[in-house]
């Protein structure tokens, strides 16, 4: 069983059937169905913004809950590691740094994202 940390882009794509990454996100989550899925609290929140705007927050929460993943709180260590990542990679946004720092703190086997720019940030990063 692998430990997989999910970026908000994966959940956003999963929840939106017209998102260009929807099919890739669906396939990736099916592939990792037996793995230990984690999502940082920041990415969980980010993934609910669009559904909340459309009045579908509860539907989105239920869909995410069906994936049986754990929402990981942002600890001091994760926040500090994210700050270090941002210092080294100025173009990296804080929400993205928090996902990568969470993966590092949990010793994740894989960090799954839809953002191709993350490839340069580590071996454990997989892009949809």
Please describe what each predicted stretch is.
Residues 71-114:
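Active-site neighborhoods of divalent-metal-dependent phosphate/nucleic-acid chemistry enzymes
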Residues 61-64, 70-74, 119-128:
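Internal alpha/beta domain cores that form substrate/cofactor-binding pockets in large enzymes
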Residues 6-7, 39-41, 92-93, 115, ...:
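Histidine- and aromatic-rich ligand-binding microenvironments
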Residues 1-38, 51-62, 116, 120:
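Short, well-structured N-terminal submotif of metal-dependent ribonuclease cores
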Residues 54-58, 90, 127-128:
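Short, hinge-like loop/turn segments at secondary-structure boundaries
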Residues 45-48, 83:
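Amphipathic alpha-helical segments within well-ordered protein domains
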Residues 10, 43, 78, 98-99, ...:
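Alpha-helix capping/helix-boundary segments
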Residues 1-3, 46, 100-128:
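Acidic, PIN/NYN-like endoribonuclease modules and their adjacent C-terminal/linker elements
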């Amino acid at each position: 069983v692998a430990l997989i940390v999910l970026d908000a882009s994966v959940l956003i794509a999963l929840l939106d059937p017209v998102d260009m990454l929807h099919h890739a996100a669906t396939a990736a989550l099916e592939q990792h169905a037996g793995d230990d899925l984690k999502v940082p609290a920041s990415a969980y929140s980010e993934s609910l913004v669009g559904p909340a705007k459309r009045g579908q927050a509860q539907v989105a929460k239920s869909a995410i809950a069906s994936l049986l993943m754990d929402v990981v709180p942002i600890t001091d260590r994760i926040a500090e590691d994210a700050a270090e990542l941002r210092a080294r990679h100025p173009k990296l946004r804080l929400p993205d740094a928090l996902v990568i720092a969470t993966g590092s703190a949990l010793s994740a086997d894989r960090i799954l994202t839809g953002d191709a720019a993350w490839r340069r940030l580590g071996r454990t990063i997989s892009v949809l």
